[in-house]
Regions:
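ABC ATPase "signature
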Residues: 174-175
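H-loop/switch region of ABC-family ATPase nucleotide-binding domains
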Residues: 150-151
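Conserved ABC ATPase "signature" region
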Residues: 56, 68-85
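The feature captures the beta-strand-to-loop junction immediately N-terminal to the Walker
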Residues: 4-6
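ABC nucleotide-binding domain "signature motif"
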Residues: 25-36, 171
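A short, surface-exposed alpha-helical micro-motif characterized by mixed small hydrophobic
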Residues: 156-158
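Conserved ABC ATPase "signature" C-loop
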Residues: 168-169, 184
Length: 189
């Protein structure tokens, strides 16, 4: 599912509520005990720790045990394309490097629910293509729920079957990508 809306409409707030970072003002969110990960630029890393140390920290915060993380460590590092930077503090990373590492952890340490907040457009063209392909394979797994917030209609058309349109903190429309995106694009133009 994709989520669209102008800046300030509540997209990231909704993802953070689903992830349990804070509670909704009304109603409740029941994830039925499923594991969940939130991929958002600037969320979750300890800047003084190396990329490698942050892989372990992030994995443990997602509910994985150290042996499970160690089993996937090389795959995460390889996918991130960070090379020797993996052992440097993440405070030395560019925003693109930071996002590559965050995406790699989330994509390789597969949780049952993945929340992706505006990060699929970060990185060079090669990494974007690789990220799209990985996301597509994760989405094809029917045992996983993927929710993507993006301002890119092209991204949403490629990856999402359904769209939730938020406006001023309220659901303006929900339906198939083909139904909702044209109306949203017209509204925004």
């Amino acid at each position: 599912m994709g989520i669209v809306g102008k800046n300030g409409s509540g997209k990231s707030t909704l993802l953070k509520a689903i992830a349990g970072i804070f509670s909704p003002d009304e109603g409740e969110i029941d994830l039925h005990g499923h594991s969940i990960s939130l991929l958002s630029i600037g969320v979750g890393f300890q800047n003084k720790l190396s990329g490698r140390e942050n892989i372990f920290l992030s994995g443990m915060l997602l509910g994985f045990e150290r042996p499970q993380i160690e089993e996937k460590l090389d795959e995460i590092i390889e996918f991130s394309e960070l090379g020797d930077f993996i052992d440097r503090p993440v405070k030395t990373y560019s925003s693109g490097m930071y996002s590559k590492l965050a995406f790699s952890i989330t994509a390789i340490l597969e949780t049952e629910i993945m929340l992706i907040d505006e990060v699929l457009s970060v990185g060079d063209a090669k990494f974007k293509k690789k990220s799209y392909e990985k996301m597509r394979s994760l989405i094809m797994n029917k045992d996983r729920t993927v929710v993507i917030v993006s301002h890119s209609s092209d991204t949403l058309r490629k990856l999402c079957d359904n769209i939730l349109w938020l406006h001023d903190g309220e659901v303006k429309m929900q339906g198939t990508t083909e139904e909702v995106l044209p109306l949203y694009e017209e509204f925004m133009s």
